[in-house]
């Protein structure tokens, strides 16, 4: 029988033991382990050099970028009812999820103003609860980053404790985890009717943020903006790019606030000559928290932070019919259409928009195309790729 393209058979290499010609062993696992270790070492070296993770995400089926950024769950001190509602939404909605810090409370005695003593749950208890929650929608979590509570020091004991607690959970589900910041590039097809006419990239800077909260909520947004610009400048310098982010998403401050910043961007033709400019929107979003009322000094800084503010983002691009590739332009070739809405309302229930999105973003038209693409694949490959594609 001919071995198919998607065969899961592997080559077994029987290596003869040097000290006993009658003993043989299979060194495949050893070679694979060495390969994995070298790959991880190279990736970690890049992360240490830049402090920034980079994740390209291809929107494979459909033309919408869909994602939910989550931070500051502080799981063991979070409101159980709100946790349950968010789990239900993520489990039943076609969307990507990005975690960016303080998902666990990680009680550490002697740190963070005695906050560690406000819960009777241990770190092991919290890990078990978070693992159970994550297992419901782990296939939708494309990456995770950050998590330093209120300590920005790179080698702080608190950060070390957090990473040690949460990294194994993400690795268990195959979710890439970046200790610091993350730049996500969504590669988006652009459609005109039912025909793909091009592609573009949506850039998101995702991080946890650090430092004390400002006296006003908008001040925390400004800190998020400044820290996000620092990340993208370092990213551009290291990779030789000229990326201007579409989103800067942070947490840490529990600010429940957002602001749009306008920056001027040039438009270039195929020869690299500037043929105009336009005002580009950088959407800066600072998450709230779902901790109970007195579990954080940040909560006392901003009394309304307990209003759930986790949002669903949906972005697609439309073709600019007025764009002239050979002339001057004051708007880009592809224009983003951004939809965002709160997943929960102020009562802690699923919002009407969230219910509608959860129900309607189920495009079954892709099913036949996927079956055609993977007609010779085993079921596991078909299911995994199909789910991953839809989730993007």
Report residues per predicted region:
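Active-site neighborhood of phospho(di)ester-bond hydrolases with catalytic His/Asp-centered motifs
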Residues: 68-72, 96-102, 141-148, 177-179, ...
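A short C-terminal boundary segment appended to hydrolase-like catalytic domains
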Residues: 305-392
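Acidic, histidine-bearing metal-coordination/catalytic regions of metal-dependent phosphoesterases
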Residues: 1-69, 392
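Core catalytic region of metal-dependent phosphoesterases/phosphodiesterases
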Residues: 53-64, 70, 75-178
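Ligand-binding grooves and catalytic loops that recognize ribose/phosphate and carbohydrate rings
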Residues: 7, 11, 112-135, 228, ...
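Conserved beta-sheet core of the metallophosphoesterase superfamily
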Residues: 201-205, 210-324
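An acidic, phosphate/nucleotide-engaging active-site surface
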Residues: 155-207, 211-219
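Beta-strand-turn-beta hairpins that frame and shape the catalytic cleft
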Residues: 56-68, 185-205, 277-282
């Amino acid at each position: 029988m001919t071995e198919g393209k998607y065969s899961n058979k592997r080559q077994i290499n029987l290596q003869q033991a040097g000290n006993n010609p009658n003993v043989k062993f299979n060194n495949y696992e050893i070679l694979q382990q060495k390969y994995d270790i070298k790959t991880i070492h190279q990736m970690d070296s890049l992360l240490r050099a830049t402090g920034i993770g980079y994740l390209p995400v291809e929107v494979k089926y459909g033309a919408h970028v869909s994602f939910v950024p989550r931070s500051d769950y502080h799981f063991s001190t979070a409101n159980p009812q709100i946790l349950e509602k968010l789990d239900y939404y993520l489990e039943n909605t076609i969307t990507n999820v990005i975690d960016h810090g303080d998902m666990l409370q990680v009680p550490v005695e002697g740190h963070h103003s005695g906050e560690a003593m406000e819960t009777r749950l241990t770190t092991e208890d919290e890990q078990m609860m978070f693992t159970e929650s994550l297992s419901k929608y782990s296939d939708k979590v494309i990456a995770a980053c950050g998590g330093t509570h209120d300590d920005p020091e790179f080698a702080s004991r608190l950060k070390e404790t957090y990473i040690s607690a949460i990294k194994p959970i993400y690795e268990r589900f195959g979710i890439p985890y970046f200790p610091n910041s993350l730049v996500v590039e969504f590669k988006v097809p652009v459609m005109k009717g039912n025909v793909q006419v091009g592609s573009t990239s949506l850039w998101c800077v995702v991080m946890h943020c650090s430092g004390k909260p400002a006296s006003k909520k908008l001040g925390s947004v400004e800190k998020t903006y400044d820290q996000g610009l620092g990340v993208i400048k370092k990213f551009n310098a290291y990779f030789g790019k000229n990326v201007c982010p579409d989103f800067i998403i942070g947490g840490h401050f529990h600010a429940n606030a957002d602001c749009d910043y306008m920056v001027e961007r040039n438009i270039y033709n195929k020869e690299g000559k500037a043929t105009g400019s336009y005002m580009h929107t950088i959407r800066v979003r600072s998450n709230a928290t779902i901790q109970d009322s007195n579990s954080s000094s940040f909560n006392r800084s901003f009394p309304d932070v307990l209003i759930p503010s986790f949002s669903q983002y949906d972005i697609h691009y439309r073709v600019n019919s007025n764009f002239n590739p050979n002339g001057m332009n004051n708007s880009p070739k592809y224009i983003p259409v951004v939809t965002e809405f709160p997943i929960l309302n102020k009562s802690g229930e699923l919002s009407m928009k969230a219910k509608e999105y959860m129900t309607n973003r189920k495009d079954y038209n892709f099913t036949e195309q996927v079956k055609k693409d993977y007609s010779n694949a085993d079921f596991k490959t078909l299911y995994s790729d199909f789910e991953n594609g839809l989730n993007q």
